[in-house]
Structures are given as structure tokens and as C-alpha cells.
Amino acid sequence: MAKQIAGICELCGRSDVQLTEHHLTPKEEGGTFLPTAMLCIPCHKQIHALYTNQELAVRLNGMAELRSDPELARFVKWIRKQPPEKLIKTKKSNERKKKK
């Protein structure tokens, strides 16, 4: 994971959170030099727990797509209510487990 800085998460909008760089198209799918977004650790972890790199590259490779995804939207609605210092445990979704 890249160097962390404090700021505002581009997905959930929480402020004063530790941010990490999320490659909108995963590096493994050719996104090394493509756009990135600065996300809080919980949002970043949740994205990778829910979706495969291939899914992210094909259908969720932009902030608008991530924000409009129903499964992720439920998480974002919840995390917005959490204090900035809250870190969460993530598990792969059952759907993602089946895809492997």
C-alpha cells in the first residue's frame, strides 16, 4: 500500500482520515499509469473485499461507477456515520469467494 496521508476520502467524504491511493484500474489490469483516487483505509479495503481486480477494471474503473454501485453504496452510507479514527475489519463477500 502506498504512503498514507490525512485528508478527505474521495468516496465517503469523511475528513481528517488516513488516505491511501487507489488505482481506479488495478495495476494488475494495466492501470499503473492511469487515474487514481485517494480513499480512506476502510473504503479502500471494502472495495477490494467486494470486487475482483477484473471487475474493477471492467465495470468499476471510475469514481462515478464506484459511487453508483448498490453494494458499495450501502457501505458508504454506513461508513459516513463512523468517526474518522474507526478502522474496520473486512471480509471477502460470499459472491467474491465464489468467483475465485
Swiss-Prot record:
Top-level taxonomic group: Bacteria
PANTHER family tied to this protein: HNH DOMAIN-CONTAINING PROTEIN, TUDOR DOMAIN-CONTAINING PROTEIN
Name of the molecule in the record: Uncharacterized protein YisB
Originating species: Bacillus subtilis (strain 168)
High-level lineage: Bacteria, Bacillati, Bacillota, Bacilli, Bacillales
